Amino acid sequence: DMTADILIAPTRVGGDWWDGGQYMEQCMHSWKPNSYSVENCWTYCTEGLTTVNSVYNIIEKSEAMSDELKLQYLSELRGLRAFWYYVIVDIFGNAPLVTDFEDTSLPSITSRADLYKYVVKELTEIIPNLRSDVSDASYGKFTQGAARMVLAKMYLNAEEWIGEPNWKGVVEQCDEIMKLEYIIEPNWKTNFEVHNEVSREIIFPICYKASDAWGNSIHLWTLHYLDPDVLGFTGGMWNGINAQPDFVRTFDTEDPRYEGSFLIGPMIDPSTGEILKTTLGHDLIHTIDLNVVPGTEKTDADGNLTPWGEVHQEDGARINKWVYEKGMQNTNMENDIAIFRLADVYLMKAEALVRMGRDLGEATRLVNAIRERAYGNSDHNYTSVTLDDIYNERGYELAFEFVRRQDMIRFGTYLKPRYMKPKQTPEYRKIFPIPFKAWQKNNNLVQNPGYPAF
């Protein structure tokens, strides 16, 4: 989402968060095969796959469990592997297909189209073997709901990824998910509470505990150093990530999701009733805008002056979607993060119906169900929903939930100039390059089109 229109990690006065310009690169779409963010993303994906293949290898050889239980576990692992390849298809397009942990040969590249077919085939095969219940026992596991959600995402983006739209497939998978026992939680914030494992809207979460060595650390990334004094906990914040101003301004300020997503305004010292002061003596007021200090503008790799410059500590709307637990003491957060939830299913089905020009009444009903839950009434309902309405609603409902870049590509807005990104981006940057370090380890890899060949 740092490459989309939703998040930004601005450089602060004094150079904090410059970090070699990696965040400017992400915002301006100027990343390279040796960029840290590209390497980091590739590493997360490949290490995730290696872990899955390793555990699969152990369980496959095990004689200590019943055939039925082994089939379930192996199916869940195949689902997790397919999930990681779904992420790779989205972000990198082309990558090696590796499923055998004991095969030490250097794999060749597999095309995006073939990886797409692999993911669809794997998920289709394992669904009958996965559990379908929506319960405490199934929470956090790769269930039928999770598998169908990945399939729906594959079909939703099929036109972009393989050149063949499959809107009908989106509707079919969404309908199957809605037959399961998931619900649209009456209270939107239930999905983001400290103990949001009670939500029956969440389909596939990242599960966190405060004791995790590297758990949910959103508070560290986004909050100012003094924000915990106001929010009622302790910890060393990093004062990094903000919401992009133009994205914040797309929200209706009367929409509860506005305050439910962003921390904006003065931070009041609870002991004095006064606005806190930063170390530079400024009032700690989180503004929507990021005001670049004149004379601090940075140059790009070609030596051209950019609009990117240093901003003050207090500038920027902070992420406020996941509830900050009062009383936390230098720990990570307990809140799980939903990779998939039912609200997204409603919006995906609505989008597919509108794109097919079919059953606009049902599409409108689905979007209005999400809006009514947010506002608490039907006063803000649509009479006939459009694709633009759905695009905007996805932003309001799913902000910071890992969908914005994908949505922008699908709706044709990703490459356009926007905040801190003055130029149109070339088409090839819809996917990221294969990292140079990955090629150094495996010379069979081939660079994605548009990027410098290895």
Label for each model-derived stretch:
Residues 1-15, 39, 54, 97, ...:
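Acidic, glycine-rich segments characteristic of secretory precursors and extracytoplasmic regions
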Residues 87-96, 134, 157-164, 355-358:
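Short coil/turn linking the two alpha-helices of tandem helical-hairpin repeats
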Residues 264, 268-368:
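C-terminal substrate/ligand-recognition segments
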Residues 1-21, 123-127, 141-297:
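An aromatic- and glycine-enriched ligand-binding surface/loop that stacks and positions planar moieties
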Residues 17, 45-48, 112, 118, ...:
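Long, intrinsically disordered, low-complexity segments
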Residues 17-92, 106-114, 123-137, 317, ...:
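Conserved, well-structured interaction surfaces
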